[in-house]
Amino acid sequence: MKTYIPKNDEQNWVVVDAAGVPLGRLATLIASRIRGKHRPDFTPNLIQGDFVVVLNAEKVALTGNKLDGKVYTRYTGYQGGLRTETAREALAKHPERVIEHAVFGMLPKGRQGRSMHNRLKVYAGETHPHTAQKPQTLEVR
């Protein structure tokens, strides 16, 4: 019996509106779409997921006290260079990175995960330059 390897020829584009949607709920939906876990022929060693375009990133909802309690940290590489910012500051400066950070934490951490990063396109406003790909809208429950 030969091993079945599914074809990876179907590249779908999906648009998700993030306005008023909780960040974790949005990130889990996006991560599973990028990995391709919604497909009946899901194969873990192949990248079969969709391209996901996220709109209205600045209007994403953070429940509870997470706007002030959630802290993003990064290290500059220099001594004493640990930089922190709250979720409120991050949403004000660069709202795209908040969604990207949440989604990338849910993707695999190897070579495939890094190539899956290219399938996520996040925009702060309502417009996007991917209309030529004819993306389908996806509702978040």
UniProtKB/Swiss-Prot annotation:
UniProt GO cellular component terms: cytosolic large ribosomal subunit
Encoding gene, per UniProt annotation: rplM
GO molecular function terms attached to this record: mRNA binding; structural constituent of ribosome
Function: This protein is one of the early assembly proteins of the 50S ribosomal subunit, although it is not seen to bind rRNA by itself. It is important during the early stages of 50S assembly.
Keywords: Ribonucleoprotein, Ribosomal protein
InterPro entries: Ribosomal_uL13, Ribosomal_uL13_bac-type, Ribosomal_uL13_CS, Ribosomal_uL13_sf
UniProt superkingdom: Bacteria
A biological process term (GO) from this entry: translation
Protein name: Large ribosomal subunit protein uL13
One Pfam family cited in the UniProt record for this chain: Ribosomal_L13
CDD domains hit by this protein: Ribosomal_L13 (cd00392)
